[in-house]
Design a protein with these regions (language model features):
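Conserved acidic donor-binding segment of nucleotide-sugar-dependent glycosyltransferases
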Residues: 233-243, 250-256
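Conserved catalytic-core segment of nucleotide-activated headgroup transferases in glycan assembly
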Residues: 87, 97-190
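Donor nucleotide-sugar binding/catalytic pocket of nucleotide-sugar-dependent glycosyltransferases
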Residues: 26, 54-61, 65-107
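Acidic donor-binding loop of glycosyltransferase active sites
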Residues: 72, 175, 189-203, 214-217
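Short, small-residue-biased leader/transition segments that mark boundaries at the very start
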Residues: 2-3
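Acceptor-binding helix/loop patch of EC 2.4 sugar-transfer enzymes
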Residues: 25-65, 125
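Short hydrophobic beta-strand element within catalytic cores of glycosyltransferases
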Residues: 207-211, 217-221
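Short acidic/histidine- and often glycine-rich active-site loop of Leloir-type glycosyltransferases
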Residues: 222-233, 237-238
Length: 260
């Protein structure tokens, strides 16, 4: 009997189910990414904002708020998102934090592997727009600085990407290589510097958790590491500007002590 059960819904695409679920059922929504936060940043990247763009942003924001209020409980992945959520929906009760998890297996027991010369990796599929933005930003903004420093490297992109998108970037940035799906992500990442140039979104970046578990050094942005209590220069390198990001990549690639 569904009325005696707890119903858990996850991901923004299914958020509207809250309008359909019975009132006398315990309902939980797990919000992996606050969509209006992502949209708020995306719209600032438009070459030109129209009144229609702003109207659609506010419509989507109002929908997200009203749909979330239909659930008895809401779970977010970070304390940062929990505080934002409290202000967003106007209540502090029934909002909980539950960090993302990754499969550990035997990765913690595996040895650290020093970075191979100039090998960079990025984990994420194109269908999640913040990943596409991250790779495009790295190519257009960071790679020119790496080239100026005569830094020889390859960037291996792991995940599902359309051929035409990668081909378009590769025509200008041949350092970019599509690795696609890899069966053993932890082993594949070893010996690389992971780059996480995320500028958009909320929640917790699984790619950072994977890098940590695989004992892989990484460079990220403040947005990329948001919600995770990592310190710049101790746990990773955190840089937001393209030139600084390039310098951090070079430093990690060439300094075995810093890699640890």
């Amino acid at each position: 009997d569904v009325y005696k059960r707890q119903i858990q819904v996850e991901f923004y695409e299914l958020l509207s189910l809250g309008f359909l679920l019975p009132e006398n059922v315990q309902t939980i929504f797990v919000h992996h990414e606050l969509r209006y936060i992502r949209n708020e940043k995306e719209i600032t990247l438009f070459r030109e904002q129209t009144a229609g763009d702003r109207m659609l942003f506010h419509i989507a924001k109002d929908f997200e708020r009203s749909a979330l209020l239909k659930y008895k409980d809401v779970i977010v992945l970070t304390e940062v998102d929990r505080k934002i959520m409290e202000d967003f929906i106007g209540r502090k009760d029934h909002i909980y934090t539950s960090p993302a998890v990754v499969q550990v297996g035997d990765r913690l027991e595996q040895p650290f592997v020093p970075v191979q010369s100039g090998r960079l990796t990025f984990v994420g599929s194109e269908d999640h727009f913040p990943n596409l933005d991250a790779v495009a930003w790295f190519c257009h903004e960071v790679i020119p600085h790496l080239r100026k420093r005569h830094f020889s490297f390859t960037l291996q992109v792991i995940g599902k990407w359309r051929g035409e998108c990668i081909n378009r970037l590769q025509s200008e940035y041949p350092e970019l290589k599509l690795a696609g799906y890899v069966e053993d992500l932890g082993s594949f990442l070893k010996g690389s510097v992971a780059v996480v140039p995320i500028r958009i979104g909320s929640g917790m970046r699984m790619k950072i958790l994977d890098a940590v578990l695989s004992k892989v050094p990484f460079v990220t942005t403040a947005k990329g590491v948001e919600g995770i209590d990592f310190k710049d220069g101790e746990d990773c390198l955190i840089v937001d500007d393209p030139a600084g990001f390039a310098e951090a990549v070079i430093a990690l690639s060439s300094n075995p002590q810093l890699q640890r």
